[in-house]
């Protein structure tokens, strides 16, 4: 690489960034098209048992891995699970925690807010969906000498990565559910994850069942979420 192909900035090499550029009319079409794809995304709980190729799932994880992160630490691990024995273990443990949540931990207001979703402590989708993605946040890392190294904005970083993951799932023609049984420590034990990794999100992924229904709920209008300053 010749000298003109990079610059040294504050002692570190920086390479040129040449993003794809489009005419403005194409940009408008692409932005609207992406929005139309994204607005079709729904959380589902009725999955088809139709297999999903592992190759697709790997590319979805690759997409999540392109997310920005604090100090570029990339503080995440994504576990892909299709093994039926492991999925059953996860379901049993999740339902034990969810039973306690629905019967003892959740407030009346919380339970009332959940009523339109039609949910309860039973989580059959954990076994029905062909794949589970379990996202772990890495609260610290270890260097090659076994010393702890800091990670920064870990929750924000993995949240961004999971958002990109959900859009990638929808873009591929698949559906997903964001599931957060609380507490989730059982995921660390079942998947044998190290002490520096904490479970963040359990995402069943697959094709929507032909008879899938979703709640008749609506997203906020643009005026409720966007303020423009010109």
Identify the residue ranges that each predicted region occupies.
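Short loop-to-beta-strand entry elements in the cores of soluble alpha/beta enzymes
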Residues: 71-82
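Glycine-rich phosphate/pyrophosphate-binding beta-alpha loops
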Residues: 65-71
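Small-aliphatic-rich amphipathic alpha-helix that forms the alpha element of a beta-alpha
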Residues: 41, 59-65, 133, 139-190
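N-terminal accessory segments that position/regulate proteins before the catalytic core
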Residues: 1-44, 48-58, 89-92, 103-104
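Glycine/small-residue-rich phosphate/adenosyl-binding loop
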Residues: 4-7, 80-158
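C-terminal helix-cap and adjacent tail motif
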Residues: 2-26, 201-230
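A glycine-rich helix N-cap at a beta->alpha junction
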Residues: 98-106, 192-215
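Glycine-rich, charged/polar anion/phosphate-binding loops
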Residues: 63-65, 116-121, 187-189, 212
């Amino acid at each position: 690489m010749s000298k003109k192909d990079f610059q040294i900035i504050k002692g570190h090499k920086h390479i040129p960034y040449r993003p794809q550029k489009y005419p403005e009319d194409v940009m408008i079409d692409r932005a609207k098209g992406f929005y139309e794809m994204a607005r079709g995304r729904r959380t589902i709980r009725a999955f088809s048992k139709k297999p999903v190729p592992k190759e697709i799932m790997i590319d979805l994880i690759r997409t999540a891995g392109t997310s920005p992160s604090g100090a570029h630490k990339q503080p995440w691990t994504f576990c892909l699970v299709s093994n039926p024995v492991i999925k059953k273990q996860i379901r049993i443990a999740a339902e034990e925690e969810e039973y306690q949540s629905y019967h003892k931990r959740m407030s009346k207001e919380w339970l009332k807010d959940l009523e339109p979703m039609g949910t309860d402590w039973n989580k059959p989708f954990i076994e029905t969906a062909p794949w589970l993605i379990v996202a772990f946040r890495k609260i610290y890392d270890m260097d090659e000498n076994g010393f702890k190294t800091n990670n920064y904005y870990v929750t924000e970083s993995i949240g961004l990565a999971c958002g990109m993951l959900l859009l990638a799932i929808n873009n591929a023609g698949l559906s997903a559910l964001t599931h957060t049984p609380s507490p989730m420590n059982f995921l660390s034990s079942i998947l044998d994850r190290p002490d520096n990794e904490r479970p963040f999100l359990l995402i069943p992924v697959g094709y929507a069942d032909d008879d899938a229904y979703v709640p008749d709920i609506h997203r906020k209008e643009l005026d409720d979420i966007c303020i423009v300053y010109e």
